[in-house]
């Protein structure tokens, strides 16, 4: 989700030291927290709705398909919207749309129709997409260019804080409530949590509508002074988009299957509620890794760090597939630590030197987040065909590409 982002950005050379971007960055961390929280809550929603509607693995992965499919449909229009109305207004629009999506869970629970839940998730994800398109590049240009990747890694650490808290929140308010409910009332377990989230997004929208964050422009010269054309002309951006696709696909796929995997008798045999609490270790590892990475990657080469983490993730997945019991459990949970720097590192490397094409490039990268819709669906089909254990071979392919991008593909 890097040493510095290597850009030639004169925007900051004369003004960065004179401006205080601290308050704006602090406000943006709230958005990253909520984005991570709402996304990771799907990991709890999947086993819950799987039980409510008696779904197989492939059908339950439609939750991620609809959520991350929104990135594919909304990202490019969102990039144009943000470029037209400013980063701040884009953030406000994203928050409002996300609030509406959360509110739609109330009628979905009342009618107890799986398709309505999927529709609500799509609307919610559309709002989150707009937030991602506006917030990610905004962070990279709020401050010195040589520390852009470090700032993005730090804000992503708060995204990870949200993903760490979400499983516990979901375990208590969704899975535990569903355990005590009748079959007909199980779907209602999501109403109160998502009502709270709708209110939270609404409050944040009001706050950002009132705030006056610094207005910065994307006036850096692009690599080779390519003022014409589009962001698609940059090879490292295109390969980076593939990197985002496979990274998000792998991360979402692993996270989506954790509750069911840890509930498997051959692994840990945990109850779904206990398994959900353990999911916090996976996302907590990513949080810790991002805080460490925010400081360490000021001194470490971006690409080499990315490749190293990808290789370790591959080793951990092989251990997960080849073993059972607590070794398999802790191996898969440890992957979160090495996922930590991947998204911000790929993102910052891919946006290097895009200049006036930065908004479009950000939209393309967010478009690639559709990997979170496709890869889990494939792993779901594998889980139905060969079992949930062997299905963890799928993310290995994704991490292999990430290693390639870190060593070779990111060179511009």
From Swiss-Prot:
For whether the record's keyword set contains Cell membrane, the answer is: yes
User: What domain of life does the UniProt record list for this protein's source?
Assistant: Bacteria
Segments spanning the bilayer are 21-41, 62-82, 90-110, 113-133, 158-178, 192-212, 239-259, 310-330, 331-351, 363-383, 388-408
Q: Where in the cell is it found?
A: Cell inner membrane
| Primary localisation category | membrane
Q: Name one GO molecular function term.
A: galactose transmembrane transporter activity
Q: How does it sit in the membrane?
A: Multi-pass membrane protein
The record's Gene Ontology biological-process terms are:
D-glucose transmembrane transport
Q: Where in the sequence is the signal peptide annotated?
A: none
Query: Keywords on this record?
Result: Cell inner membrane, Cell membrane, Membrane, Sugar transport, Transmembrane, Transmembrane helix, Transport
**GO CC term, one of those recorded:** plasma membrane
Q: Does the keyword Membrane apply?
A: yes
The family assignment reads: Belongs to the major facilitator superfamily. FHS transporter (TC 2.A.1.7) family.
Described by its record, this protein's role is as follows: Intake of glucose and galactose.
Q: What is this protein called?
A: Glucose/galactose transporter
Supply the source organism for this entry. Answer: Brucella melitensis biotype 1 (strain ATCC 23456 / CCUG 17765 / NCTC 10094 / 16M)
């Amino acid at each position: 989700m890097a040493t510095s982002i290597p850009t030639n950005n004169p925007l900051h050379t004369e003004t960065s030291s004179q401006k205080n971007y601290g308050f704006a960055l602090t406000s943006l961390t709230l958005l990253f927290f909520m984005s991570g929280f709402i996304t990771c809550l799907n990991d709890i929603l999947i086993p819950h709705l799987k039980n409510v509607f008696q779904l197989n693995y492939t059908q339950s992965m439609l939750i991620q398909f609809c959520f991350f499919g929104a990135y594919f449909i909304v990202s490019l229009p969102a990039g144009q919207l943000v470029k037209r109305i400013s980063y701040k207004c884009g953030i406000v629009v994203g928050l409002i749309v996300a609030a509406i999506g959360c509110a739609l869970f109330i009628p979905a629970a009342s009618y107890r129709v799986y398709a309505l839940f999927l529709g609500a998730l799509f609307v919610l994800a559309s709002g989150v997409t707009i937030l991602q398109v506006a917030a990610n590049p905004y962070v990279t240009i709020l401050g010195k260019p040589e520390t852009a990747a470090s700032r993005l890694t730090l804000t992503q650490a708060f995204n990870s804080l949200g993903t760490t808290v979400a499983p516990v929140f979901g375990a208590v308010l969704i899975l535990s409530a569903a355990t005590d409910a009748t079959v007909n009332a199980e779907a209602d377990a999501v109403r109160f949590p998502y009502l709270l989230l709708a209110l939270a997004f609404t409050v944040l929208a009001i706050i950002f509508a009132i705030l006056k964050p610094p207005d910065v422009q994307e006036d850096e010269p692009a690599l080779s002074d390519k003022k014409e054309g589009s962001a698609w002309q940059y090879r490292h951006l295109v390969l980076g988009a593939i990197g985002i696709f496979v990274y998000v696909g792998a991360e979402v796929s692993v996270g989506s299957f954790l509750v069911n995997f840890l509930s498997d008798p051959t692994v840990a045999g945990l109850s779904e509620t206990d398994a959900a609490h353990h999911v916090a270790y996976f996302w907590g590892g990513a949080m810790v890794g991002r805080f460490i990475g925010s400081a360490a990657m000021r001194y470490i080469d971006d690409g080499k760090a990315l490749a190293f983490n990808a290789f370790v993730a591959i080793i951990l997945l092989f251990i997960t597939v080849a073993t059972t019991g607590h070794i398999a459990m802790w191996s898969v949970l440890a992957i979160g630590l090495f996922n930590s720097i991947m998204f911000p590192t790929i993102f910052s490397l891919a946006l290097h030197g895009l200049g006036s094409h930065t908004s479009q490039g950000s939209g393309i990268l967010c478009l690639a987040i559709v990997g979170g819709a496709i890869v889990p669906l494939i792993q779901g089909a594998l889980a139905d065909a060969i079992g949930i254990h062997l299905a963890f071979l799928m993310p290995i392919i994704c991490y292999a590409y990430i290693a390639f991008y870190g060593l070779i593909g990111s060179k511009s």
